[in-house]
């Protein structure tokens, strides 16, 4: 089983990601799961709204 790592993301970066997502998808607020990957496809941020 793969280890799950938790990365702490500061609130400013998280708000910036949210602004960009809302600009492209007005229904973003419906989303519950966001994954951000780098150029190689490695997951760098995962946000789960509860």
Swiss-Prot record:
Its EC number is 1.12.99.-. One of its GO terms (molecular function) is metal ion binding. Ni(2+) binds at residues 27, 30. Residues 34-50 form a propeptide. Keywords: Metal-binding, Nickel, Oxidoreductase, Selenocysteine. The keyword Oxidoreductase applies. It is an enzyme of class 1 (oxidoreductase). Its cofactor is Ni(2+). It comes from the Archaea. The keyword Metal-binding applies. Belongs to the [NiFe]/[NiFeSe] hydrogenase large subunit family. The large subunit of Vhu is split into VhuA and VhuU. Each contributes two ligands to the [NiFeSe] center. NCBIfam families: VhuU. The F420-non-reducing hydrogenase vhu is composed of four subunits; VhuA, VhuD, VhuG and VhuU. This is F420-non-reducing hydrogenase vhu subunit U. It comes from Methanocaldococcus jannaschii (strain ATCC 43067 / DSM 2661 / JAL-1 / JCM 10045 / NBRC 100440). The lineage of its organism: Archaea, Methanobacteriati, Methanobacteriota, Methanomada group, Methanococci. The gene is vhuU.
